[in-house]
């Protein structure tokens, strides 16, 4: 007699939730992130991010280094937009000191800050679409990424983790011919953005994977603390370059792009549209560049130039004190928020009057943005979780610190 395999009419099927580990060794996590995912069949019911696999202890380390030494630690937090972290750090220390940054140094900071944003978004476009199974855009985006890193190398000597900014200004001036190379790169980027748009912006497979997936409405985005492109993709046009200008951003003409959709497609499009705004800002910066000093003239903050060391004993003393001990900001605390490729970055620095910070607290956007993952993923299919994680765009060094 054949066994009856079909349930009786009206009988309920008993199902159990399945718990699945994604990472910490998984290419779609873009680092060592572990996700514990509960699923009912193919649908996600809960996502719990497990962080800490890349914990570096930078905050504590920075409390045992001089203020100037810490410039080399800050950029290693977000290794895709390193300039954002070193800029946020030096701005907070300069606020403590009351330092005066020369105009040329501020313009160079803006140019490199926006080049760093372009670099980060290029990695987002290439790796994000790779997560969805599209291999070709990866090579297109990394073509421009390598050209961008060539510019960093020419200025700093490093392609990543640059450490070029200094409290009070810059480490050194721009090399000869660098601005012409930047202009050539911007022309290349404009052609590249057109190619990226042609490749996937109207691709029906990409649209099916991204449109309406992982929707985060504006009120939820604000409650979750989202900032940057992820917040603007939910219809909230907040940007620290406009709302809390720094480095003279109030003198630059650019638009804050936003979208009311709040889905994965909107988060992708934010980065594409921000390419053009960054290009616009950099071109204005190139026009603003004028010859001039690149450091605060206060010798108690900035190292004296080498030619002064040959003729001035006072310069030698300042140099010795800065190298061996560093400067001493007055008692106080400072926090300057800036706009990185992922959102608001800020370094809360407390001074006790010594040559090392009493406390450094890093406000990193990736850590906060990752808290929105479960909200965006509940109810979607597992394949969509990878899409949503890619569009949130966390950097694990930015998360764990």
From Swiss-Prot:
Primary site of residence = membrane
- What keywords does the record list, in alphabetical order? Cell membrane, Membrane, NAD, Quinone, Translocase, Transport
Instruction: Give any GO molecular function from the UniProt entry.
Output: NAD binding
Q: Give a Gene Ontology cellular component term annotated to this protein.
A: plasma membrane
> Does the record carry Membrane as a key word?
yes
EC class, as a word, reads translocase
Which compartments does it reside in?
Answer: Cell membrane
Membrane topology recorded in Swiss-Prot or TrEMBL:
Peripheral membrane protein
Q: In which domain of life is the source organism classified?
A: Bacteria
Give its E.C. classification number: 7.1.1.-
What is this enzyme's catalytic activity, as reactions?
a quinone + NADH + 5 H(+)(in) = a quinol + NAD(+) + 4 H(+)(out)
A Pfam family assignment? Complex1_49kDa
Q: How does it assemble?
A: NDH-1 is composed of 15 different subunits. Subunits NuoB, C, D, E, F, and G constitute the peripheral sector of the complex.
So what family is this one in? Belongs to the complex I 49 kDa subunit family.
Q: What the protein does?
A: NDH-1 shuttles electrons from NADH, via FMN and iron-sulfur (Fe-S) centers, to quinones in the respiratory chain. The immediate electron acceptor for the enzyme in this species is believed to be a menaquinone. Couples the redox reaction to proton translocation (for every two electrons transferred, four hydrogen ions are translocated across the cytoplasmic membrane), and thus conserves the redox energy in a proton gradient.
Query: HAMAP family, from UniProt?
Result: NDH1_NuoD
Kindly provide the name given to this protein in its UniProt entry.
NADH-quinone oxidoreductase subunit D
Species annotation: Deinococcus radiodurans (strain ATCC 13939 / DSM 20539 / JCM 16871 / CCUG 27074 / LMG 4051 / NBRC 15346 / NCIMB 9279 / VKM B-1422 / R1)
Q: Which gene encodes it?
A: nuoD
């Amino acid at each position: 007699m054949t066994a009856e395999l079909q349930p009786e009419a009206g009988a309920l099927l008993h199902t159990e939730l399945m718990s699945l580990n994604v990472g910490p060794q998984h290419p779609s996590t873009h680092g060592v992130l572990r996700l514990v995912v509960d699923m009912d069949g193919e649908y996600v019911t809960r996502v719990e991010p497990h962080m800490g696999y890349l914990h570096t202890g930078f905050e504590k380390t920075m409390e045992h280094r001089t203020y100037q030494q810490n410039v080399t630690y800050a950029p290693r937090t977000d290794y895709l937009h390193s300039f954002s972290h070193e800029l946020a750090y030096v701005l907070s220390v300069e606020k403590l000191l009351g330092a005066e940054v020369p105009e040329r140094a501020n313009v160079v900071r803006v140019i490199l800050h926006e080049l760093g944003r372009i670099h980060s978004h290029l990695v987002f476009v290439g790796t994000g679409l790779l997560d969805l199974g599209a291999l070709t855009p990866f090579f297109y985006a990394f073509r421009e990424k390598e050209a961008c890193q060539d510019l960093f190398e020419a200025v700093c000597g490093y392609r990543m983790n640059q450490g070029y900014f200094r409290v009070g200004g810059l480490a050194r001036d721009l090399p000869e011919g660098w601005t012409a190379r930047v202009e050539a790169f911007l022309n290349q980027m404009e052609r590249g953005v057109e190619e990226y748009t042609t490749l996937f912006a109207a691709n029906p497979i990409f649209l099916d994977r991204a449109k309406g997936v992982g929707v985060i409405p504006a009120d939820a985005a604000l409650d979750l603390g989202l900032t940057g492109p992820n917040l603007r993709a939910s219809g909230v046009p907040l940007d620290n370059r406009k709302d809390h200008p720094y480095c003279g951003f109030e003198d630059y003409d650019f638009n804050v792009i936003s979208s009311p959709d709040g889905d994965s497609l909107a988060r992708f499009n934010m980065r594409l549209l921000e390419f053009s705004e960054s290009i616009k800002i950099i071109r204005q910066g190139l026009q603003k560049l004028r010859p001039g000093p690149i450091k605060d003239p206060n010798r108690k903050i900035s190292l004296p130039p080498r030619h002064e060391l040959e003729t001035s004993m006072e310069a030698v003393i300042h140099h010795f004190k800065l190298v061996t001990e560093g400067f001493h900001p007055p008692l106080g605390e400072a926090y300057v928020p800036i706009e990185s490729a992922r959102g608001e970055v800020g370094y809360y620095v407390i001074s006790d009057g010594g040559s090392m910070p009493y406390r450094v607290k890093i406000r990193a956007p990736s850590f906060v943005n990752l808290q929105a993952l479960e909200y965006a993923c509940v109810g979607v299919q597992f394949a969509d979780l990878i899409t949503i994680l890619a569009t949130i765009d966390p950097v694990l060094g930015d998360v764990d610190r």
